Swiss-Prot record:
Name of this protein: Ribosomal RNA small subunit methyltransferase G
EC numbers: 2.1.1.-
Subcellular location: Cytoplasm
Family: Belongs to the methyltransferase superfamily. RNA methyltransferase RsmG family.
Annotated organism of origin: Shouchella clausii (strain KSM-K16)
Amino acid sequence: MGEEFFSSLLAEQKIVLSSTQHEQFKRYFELLVEWNEKMNLTAITEKKDVYLKHFYDSITPSFYYPFTDQKIVDIGAGAGFPSLPLKILYPDLQISIIDSLNKRIGFLTHLANELELTGVSFYHDRAELAGKSKHHREIYDVAIARAVARMSVLSELCLPFVKVGGDFIALKGAGSNEEVAEGKKAIAVLGGELSASHSFQLPIEHSERQIVQIKKAKATPNKYPRKPGVPNKQPIA
């Protein structure tokens, strides 16, 4: 699984990469591996695995959601997943990444410069604090996250950023139906409602994946998100 197979998988979805996009993904991989030696960005470093489990996996929401030029916030993107592979694919997207670790922000800033990405901003902050700020609260068309947190927790971290009528998109693994069922109350309390859920298997390794789409139906109550750490310790239930 290298660049060629990555291209063939995307071609199955009617996505054809330009030479510039090919180069951007190639450089992304090189920088990820290089910086990973001095800071913990990912446990996945084999080329075939990075292309499949990071790049391809990050792009899968576009198989179900029409990305164009939306204003998107990525919560806890780590090494830039899923928003930066989506940005490479859809250059008109306006991306904001919020991450609590300043070292990662340093990597992402360098990465964006090297890949010559415009319309990207990085913020060193906790989602619980940024979600209260007038600079971020309910101004985004889409909040996106590829995180291990349960849906009840993730919804509290992400839905406050989304404007009414916008969407929260979560990239999840196996067992997501249970998570969504458990998180139904939290999603509703925060102003969201489940609008779509797409299950599929990641090629080659056939691991379960799910794209969960929550529509922001009404404004999030002012008390949310709660203080840093509280959503995780005391999920809305």
